[in-house]
Design a protein with these regions (language model features):
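Glycine-rich, mobile lid/loop segments that gate access to catalytic sites or pores
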Residues: 1-79, 93-99
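Terminal-appendage/accessory-domain detector
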Residues: 65-75, 82, 86-324
Length: 324
């Protein structure tokens, strides 16, 4: 999935697709085929069938359907592998058509993969989402939190003016300036910015329906102004975000080049533990700190091949004639 994403680029997202759904089905089919040790011919067929099941629209951001893209992709991947094992046929060059369809007609050279190519999960690696909101909000949240550390708000302070200058093409996905639900708030620049300033923390609790409808947050939301840089389309994953905050007698600005959790600004163990604790509290998991500490101790330096070997054994033990 990482290789496909790098191949298609962010233009795929700009066209209105959600890569979790469109690329996830192919990536999940490849992973499942690998775990089951499918013959090469069946593996190729499974990927081709999966490519015909690819779907996921950005238009559904802020609704229950957006997270369902993950399940749809996994379900379609399992079905694709099962059909391939059962003898279904598919084109040998489906990925070429896949690229033509999902890259908006852009001419793409075929990806070059061979046995010597490092796994993308290792090189260049993958990013960890730091906040449970749209990725396009992450740099603005980080910038606001850093400015908040410089200028800590006091109880009773008036709302500050927050000006956000985003990369060209960033505003369209953030389509809810006045969110009415927690899901909509995840895709609201005004809400995420106001919550980052007022609360000082953006976590799962920030995106409950009750939190999204807090009347006390409205005065600050009204002071958030969002603009895009003019000009040609920018790579949304690398283009910086400028945050300017103006309060009584002061004004400060910061340029955030990389999202927290990116390869250039990686999460720390403390960040991962905090994220796990937030998720565990939301899911009412007992003893979250002990579980997470154990995971980090067991897996930090474990070779990827060893992890996949263990996973394959667990899959085969549970599924028996999986996918048949």
């Amino acid at each position: 999935m990482l290789r496909l994403g790098a191949w298609l680029g962010f233009g795929h997202y700009a066209l209105g697709f959600h890569a979790t759904g469109t690329l996830g089905v192919v990536g999940a089919a490849a992973a499942y085929a690998y775990l089951l040790r499918l013959p090469v011919a069946q593996w190729r067929t499974a990927l081709s069938i999966a490519a015909s099941s690819a779907c996921g629209l950005r238009a559904n951001f802020g609704t229950d359907t957006k997270p369902l893209h993950v399940g749809f992709a996994a379900s379609a991947a399992i079905r694709a592998v099962g059909l391939a094992r059962a003898g279904a046929t598919a084109s040998d060059d489906a990925l070429a058509g896949f690229a033509q369809a999902f890259a908006g007609g852009a001419r793409l050279d075929p990806p070059r993969w061979d046995a010597l190519t490092p796994w993308a999960v290792l090189a260049p690696g993958f990013e960890v989402k730091r906040y449970p909101s749209c990725y396009l909000t992450h740099r603005m949240i980080a910038g606001i939190q850093r400015l908040r550390e410089r200028h800590p708000p006091q109880a009773g302070d008036a709302p500050v003016a927050i000006d956000l200058l985003l990369p060209h093409g960033s505003v369209a996905p953030l389509k809810y300036p006045q969110p009415r639900t927690g899901l909509q708030a995840k895709f609201s620049a005004t809400y995420c910015a106001a919550a980052a300033w007022v609360d000082g923390h953006v976590g799962l609790a920030s995106f409950s329906d009750a939190a999204a409808n807090r009347g006390a947050l409205l005065p600050q939301m009204r002071q958030v102004r969002v603009a895009e840089r003019p000009g040609p389309h920018e790579p949304l994953e690398t283009a910086p975000v400028r945050v300017t905050i103006t309060g009584p007698g002061w004004s400060d600005a910061i340029l955030v080049d990389w999202a927290p959790g990116s390869l250039q600004d990686p999460v720390t163990d403390e960040d991962l533990l905090a994220k796990w604790a937030d998720c565990a509290a939301n899911g009412q998991v007992a003893a979250p700190a002990a579980i997470a500490t154990g995971w980090l101790a067991a897996g930090m330096d474990r070779p990827m091949g060893s992890l996949l070997h263990s996973l394959r054994g667990a899959i085969l033990a549970r599924s028996g004639n999986a996918g048949g």
